[in-house]
């Protein structure tokens, strides 16, 4: 128990990082755990969901999160909100009231482009057992972001395929990736 407690402390301080199930490595200067500072709008949406549906699981991915990795910077933000399937209609109704004209429910790529709006919220179904954020459960982990990028048809339309090598190289060379988390989520997708 003492060893487990010490290991948790080292992980929390960032001296050691988790790279898989029961697998850890000493954090070097070159690689770190992924963190993103969420926009005020993302925090507002998260707060509204926590207040209205305290037990619901959800994640928020901001399109501008990719700016760290892409060659051509994204000037406009879109929130991709994934929520549990059972409650998606209720969440849609809530957000539609609070953000009129800015919410799309599981749009096709054609609908996305037709109704695109800066600051738009795209609502879709959360894959069961999706990785939860480390600081906040609703934060999107890098592992989820990478898997969604190659498996979500809407994201494939939004992000140019020519950006994929830079995104993958930047993510894999700059951040510690929990491989078991990545592959487990990829199997679920």
Residue map of PLM features:
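A short, conserved structural fragment
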Residues: 11-21
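Minor-groove-contacting beta-hairpin "wing" of winged helix-turn-helix DNA-binding domains
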Residues: 22-29
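Short, charged/polar, Gly/Pro-enriched secondary-structure boundary elements
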Residues: 30-38
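Short amphipathic alpha-helical interaction segments
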Residues: 1-12
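Hydrophobic alpha-helical interaction segments
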Residues: 99-189
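Short gly/ser-rich loop at a beta-strand->alpha-helix junction or flexible surface loop bordering the NTP-binding
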Residues: 22, 38-117
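Residues in well-ordered beta-strands of folded domains
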Residues: 25, 80-82, 122-124
């Amino acid at each position: 128990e003492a060893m487990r407690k010490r290991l948790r402390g080292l992980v929390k301080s960032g001296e050691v990082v988790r790279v898989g199930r029961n697998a850890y490595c000493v954090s070097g200067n070159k690689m770190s755990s992924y963190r993103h500072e969420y926009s005020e709008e993302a925090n507002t949406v998260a707060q509204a969901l926590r207040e209205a549906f305290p037990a619901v699981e959800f994640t928020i991915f901001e399109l501008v999160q990719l700016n760290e990795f892409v060659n051509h910077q994204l000037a406009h933000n879109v929130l991709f909100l994934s929520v549990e399937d059972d409650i998606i209609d209720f969440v849609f109704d809530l957000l539609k009231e609070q953000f009129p004209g800015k919410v799309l429910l599981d749009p096709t790529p054609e609908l996305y482009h037709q109704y695109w709006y800066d600051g738009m919220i795209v609502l879709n179904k959360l894959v069961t057992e999706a990785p939860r954020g480390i600081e906040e459960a609703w934060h999107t982990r890098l592992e989820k972001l990478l898997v969604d990028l190659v498996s979500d048809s809407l994201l494939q339309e939004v992000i140019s395929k020519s950006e994929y090598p830079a995104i993958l190289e930047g993510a894999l060379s700059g951040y510690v990736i929990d491989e078991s988390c990545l592959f487990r989520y990829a199997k679920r997708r």
